[in-house]
């Protein structure tokens, strides 16, 4: 396991904690964790990236301690445009003009949003477990995928949201238990990852992220309105992109990420990993790392 080198930067809204690893002079690769997860999920992939000569920047996303909001009055807004702006703010604070981005789940959605809104900042883009959604528009899926999204619908009723507030760790554990074939994690790893899940901001960001997709009148943060409008205008991405999908992903049906090539003007490829579920970077880190390294090398 790579040594944790935890650092802090301040932005207008956040104190962002991030792990900085690999050669200091290596080309930067930003690794964005998903939900429910934490930066430690990238440990094995990060080691391989370091061995290839690159530097990794692995932030704790908003809501995930030790990242924290500077003001209690800031809306706990969990939309991808906010997460993308956080990533840009972090890159600006570190003086990174361009970087490769690799994201899983929420991190994948954030990576696509970066590709839509800030393509000039990206050298390459890898997205794990979530297919691209043109214009950032959420549509109610077919009944099969809607069944998989039960956890999103639960959050959209007040009683469900209250149940999650009472036991966020238990709620997260159900996802780990059911989104992949069994046997991919142990109790110690889940416990270490879930340390931040009881934080009130983790719960607030979780609920806002999902409720704002489907529930009218959910709290938003108006400072991101212009980014949201721009996102709705972007259908095609130009950044060289790799999509990695587990063939046994029981959260996001693999068919949801098929046949998306037409939305990419740059190079695009999709890698389907047999026997792998929703957490490819944890379940098959060597395959993921090798694919990401090839992407970054080919992107130049």
Predicted regions and their residues:
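Glycosyltransferase donor-binding loop in the core domain
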Residues: 37, 198, 249, 277-280
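A short loop-to-beta-strand scaffold at the N-terminal edge of the catalytic core in hydrolase folds
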Residues: 11-20
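Hydrophobic residues on the short alpha-helix immediately C-terminal to a glycine-rich phosphate/catalytic loop
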Residues: 45, 114, 291-295
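Flexible "cap/lid" subdomain of the alpha/beta-hydrolase fold that forms the substrate-access gate
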Residues: 2-4, 15-16, 28, 64-98, ...
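Conserved HGGG/HGGXW glycine-rich cap/lid loop of the alpha/beta-hydrolase fold
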Residues: 19-69
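Conserved beta-strand scaffold positions in the cores of enzyme catalytic domains, especially
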Residues: 6-8, 56-58, 243, 270-272
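Conserved acidic functional residues
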Residues: 34, 105, 282
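Catalytic active-site module of serine/aspartate enzymes centered on a nucleophile-bearing elbow/loop
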Residues: 267-300
């Amino acid at each position: 396991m790579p040594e944790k080198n935890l650092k802090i930067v301040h932005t207008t809204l956040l104190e962002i904690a991030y792990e900085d690893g690999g050669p200091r002079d290596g080309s930067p690769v930003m690794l964005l964790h998903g939900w429910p997860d934490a930066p430690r999920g990238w440990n094995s992939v990060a080691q391989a990236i370091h061995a290839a000569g690159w530097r990794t920047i692995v932030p704790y996303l908003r809501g995930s301690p030790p990242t924290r909001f500077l003001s209690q009055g800031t809306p706990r807004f969990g939309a991808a445009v906010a997460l993308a702006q956080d990533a840009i703010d972090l890159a600006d604070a570190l003086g990174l003009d361009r970087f490769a981005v690799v994201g899983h789940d929420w991190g994948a959605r954030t990576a696509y949003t970066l590709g839509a809104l800030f393509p000039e900042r990206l050298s390459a883009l890898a997205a794990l477990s979530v297919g691209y959604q043109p214009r950032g528009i959420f549509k109610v899926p077919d009944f099969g995928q809607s069944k998989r999204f039960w956890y999103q619908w639960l959050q959209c009723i007040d009683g469900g949201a209250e149940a999650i507030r009472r036991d966020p760790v238990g709620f997260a554990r159900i996802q780990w238990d059911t989104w992949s074939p069994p046997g991919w994690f142990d109790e110690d790893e889940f416990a270490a990852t879930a340390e931040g899940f009881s934080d009130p901001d983790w719960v607030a960001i979780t609920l806002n992220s999902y409720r704002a997709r489907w529930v009218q009148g959910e709290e938003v943060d108006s400072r991101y309105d212009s980014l949201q409008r721009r996102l709705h205008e972007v259908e095609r991405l130009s950044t060289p992109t790799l999509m990695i999908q587990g063939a046994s992903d029981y959260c996001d049906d693999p068919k949801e990420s098929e046949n998306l090539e037409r939305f990419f003007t740059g190079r695009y490829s999709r890698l389907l990993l047999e026997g792998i579920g929703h957490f490819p970077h944890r379940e098959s880190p060597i395959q993921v790392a090798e694919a990401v390294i090839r992407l970054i090398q080919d992107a130049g």
